[in-house]
Amino acid sequence: MTKKYNIAVIGATGNVGRETLNILAERNFPVNKIYAIASDNSIGREISYGEKILKISSLTNLNFDDIDIAFFCAGSEVSKEFVPKATASSCVVIDKSSLFRVDNQVPLIVPEVNLSTLTEFNTKNIIANPNCIVIPLAVALKPLDNEIKIKRVVISTYQSVSGAGKAGMDELYDQTKSKYVFGENDPKKFPKQITFNLFPHIGDLNKDGYTSEEAKIAFELNKIMGNHFKASVTSVRVPVFIGHSISVNIEFNDKMDANIAEEILQDADGIVTISNNNDLAYISPVEVVGEDAVYVSRIRNDVSKPNAINLWITCDNLRKGAALNSVQIAEELINNYL
């Protein structure tokens, strides 16, 4: 008989929390009891879990002794307060905030890339889920790096508003509607107007001119892939509801070209490649909504530098960029560790 587990999803009413519930149901995760947890103003509300309906309950009343795996999807402040309470019991935490990603005692996992480091989870009973840009980046870069070591990468990200939560999606919707009706926009969640606009500003601006998002991406990518190459990052918020895209230039230490890269990526887990065989041979964000794969297109040589290529990477940031990755981690936990 298959063992079943008690699961808690903290932040269940948010974008990532809802998607986590959806994916747990879709993938038939062996659940005994599942708890949908959210803020006090959501208590008693109903939320879907596959064909079932769950009632939202309170985090303060949750007994972590009854929970095997807790998915924290509610941001760093909630994680800071409640993850220690969870790990004081036998509960394993998969945290989707940035809080524990820099902790050397907490594994930062992308299953297709560095699953072997999951053995370190029981040091603190915490596993960190990476940034929603870092996950597809690592999935695409790792098979190439396995073949020929990467020397450096230059990354430009085009990040949808859902990466900023429900409030980000609401602001894009409200601003778009207001622009037509009233001809005005009042930014609240974002630093500038997001409708019909984009801006290279995600997170706080550091003294070196990079934003905190750009610094996170560079740090996390190197932690996951082994700290042997440099990454320069520019992060751009774009008026797209769901789906992150990445333009990346990769320089290698030895011979690499677009044809070799495409062959490598075609054989890699979790990737769908699109060949340059017509004018529409690329994937846009709207086409990946609801998809689990990381899509790689526009694979081409860098004509300005030998042993360098360019890629266009796109994925659903709420699925593989967040919820799916965490559920894949949980699947590995129950298959080999719990």
Swiss-Prot record:
Binding locations of substrate: Q159, R237
- Give the top-level enzyme category: oxidoreductase
Name a Pfam family for this protein.
Answer: Semialdhyde_dhC
Give the superkingdom in one word: Bacteria
Q: What is its EC number?
A: 1.2.1.11
Function, as annotated, reads: Catalyzes the NADPH-dependent formation of L-aspartate-semialdehyde (L-ASA) by the reductive dephosphorylation of L-aspartyl-4-phosphate.
Starting at the broadest rank, the lineage of the source organism is: Bacteria, Pseudomonadati, Pseudomonadota, Alphaproteobacteria, Rickettsiales
User: What are the GO BP annotations of this UniProt entry?
Assistant: 'de novo' L-methionine biosynthetic process; diaminopimelate biosynthetic process; isoleucine biosynthetic process; lysine biosynthetic process via diaminopimelate; threonine biosynthetic process
Chain sites annotated for binding phosphate = R101, K216
For this chain, one GO molecular function annotation is: NADP binding
| Sorted UniProt keywords | Amino-acid biosynthesis, Diaminopimelate biosynthesis, Lysine biosynthesis, Methionine biosynthesis, NADP, Oxidoreductase, Threonine biosynthesis
This chain belongs to the protein called Aspartate-semialdehyde dehydrogenase
Name the catalytic site residues.
C132, H244
Q: Where does NADP(+) bind?
A: T13, G14, N15, V16, N41, S42, S162, G163, P187, N317
